[in-house]
Structure formats: C-alpha cells, structure tokens
Amino acid sequence: IAAVICCATFPMWNAYPAIFANLATGNSAIVKPHPNGILPVAIAIRTMRKVLSDNGYAPNVLIMTADTRGDPVTIELLQHPEIPIIDYTGSQRFGIWIEENCAQKLVYTETAGCNGVIIESTENIDGLINALANGLCGFSAQMCTSPQNIHIPEHGFETNVGQISFDGFKDLLVDAINERVADPKRAAALCGAIQADESLAILDQLRNEDKASIALESFPYDHPEFPFARTASPLVLTVKPELRELYNKEHFAPVAFLIREKNPESALANATSLVRESGAISSYLYSSNKAFTEKAKDAFADAGA
C-alpha cells in the first residue's frame, strides 16, 4: 500500500503519476489531500474509482483519507506498518522530516528549493524580460519551478541593444510586470490567487526588511470571477549578495530578489552555493557566451540542481 500525500496549490499535479505508477505495479494507494485542497482530490478519486469499477476492478484499491489542520492524520498514516511506500509533495520542512523519520520505507519527495536565475548576457533582451516577468507572475510564484533569486552583475551585461545597467534591467523588468498586472482580468488569468494567508504574511515581512530596497511593491487586485479571493502582484526587492539570510530559502509567495553581484563568476558561485544549501528544482541561465554557458551547466549539475 502506498501513501500519496498531496500539496495545497496543485492538489493532483504529482498525485496522478504516483497513483498510476502504484496501480500499474499492483500497489493499492491511499491518497491524503492537503486540508486546503480536499474537493479536487475527492473529485479525481471518485472518478478513478468509477473507472476501476466499470472495468471490473475492486475500487477500494484506491481510497482517500482527509483531515483538518486541527486534527491531522498524515504522520500516523506515514508511520503505519502497512504503508511501505510514500510519495510526498509539499513543504521542504515536512519533506525533510519524512526523509529522516521514514528512512526504512521507499520514499519519494518533491518539495522546494531556491530557484535561481543568472544573467550573463543575452541576444534577445525583450525575450529575457518577458520570460522573467511571466515566470514571476505565473500562478503568483506558487509553483515549485518559479524563479526567485535573480543574479545580475552590478555593472550590467551585454545585450542585442548594447550594454544594459543593473538599474536599467530592473526598470525593464518592473515595467513588464506592471504591464501584466495593471488589468485585473489579465492579472487574474496569469497570477491566479494566493492559496494561504501565510503567503501574504511573507510579503508583509519582506517589504518591511530594512536591508532590502523595494523595486516594485506588491498590491492586491480585484479578481473578476472570485471577489473574495486573496490576490497579490509580485514584490520585487533589490539586495546585496552578502544578505543571504533574506534569500537563501524558498519564500512561498510572489516575491523576487534582484541580487547585485560583483560579476558573472560571483553570480554563478552564489547561485550554485544556494543550490547546495537549499536545493533547486529549476535553475536558469541567460548567456550568449558559449564558454560561460558550459561552465554554468557543469557547475549547476555538480551542485545538484
């Protein structure tokens, strides 16, 4: 029997492959949704149980168990002696707990990391800015692949339109984000909503940090379909590289750090060091320099990105 633990933001994103892999190999599965995401999981499980039944299989090879924040059952489920397989998607903190306390079982975890972007040079500055703006806005940066830390040389970088300064890059990025969130209808389609009050609390904490400068303030927008939804546009902060305590972990909120690095080599060293310390599910590089690109690919691979 496998336990499949779902996350709050994308309840079935990783659950589907885990469920199908277990059923295909003859394992039953108990699916445990996050308390904030019970309904979509229940709908999916009901549908899959019907498909099993319609095709002559016992539907109880797939069941769901739900809980609440006040009365959780996850740890009890994971530690049950008849659960030898665990598939978990969620916070890094609880993922580490599972890896340390359920090491005798077959454990798969997909948690989070410090996803970094290094900018060394580009032959398409418009494409770079648009891609970053979309990534920072998309799903309000609540995806495990969302970029967070953007490492930029303090003296700027070469582009197809000439040298662009650190501040020039910052202004281009801020303008692109503002363009995407100015219209609530477009903002809602791209950013969606904030799934938990904790994310709004993170924004409040970071915007009040004395050591960071606000390049772009975050604000709520009126969701055209869900008037009571939590919403927030991206918060963009500029920081010095030595202030690692501000950006050396995943902040589960729409926030990005523009890190003023000494040069591309320092940016690469800092970004890969963060991968070693905090992990990274996605790492990004913009460079038209083939030698630097190869160096960065090797460095990220060695760091475990």
Which positions does each model-derived feature cover?
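A structural micro-motif
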Residues: 27, 60, 105-106, 212, ...
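ALDH superfamily catalytic-core signature
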Residues: 16, 47-56, 93-241
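Structured core elements
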Residues: 3-4, 30, 64, 87-88, ...
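Short glycine-enriched loop/turn motifs at secondary-structure junctions
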Residues: 59, 80, 111-113, 144, ...
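Conserved short loop/turn motifs at secondary-structure junctions
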Residues: 36-37, 64-69, 148-157, 187-195, ...
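Rossmann-like NAD(P) dinucleotide-binding subdomain of oxidoreductase/dehydrogenase enzymes
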Residues: 1-129
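Short, solvent-exposed amphipathic alpha-helical segments in soluble enzyme
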Residues: 18-21, 102-104, 134-135, 272-276, ...
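Conserved C-terminal structural/oligomerization subdomain of aldehyde/semialdehyde dehydrogenase
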Residues: 55-57, 153, 168, 224-305
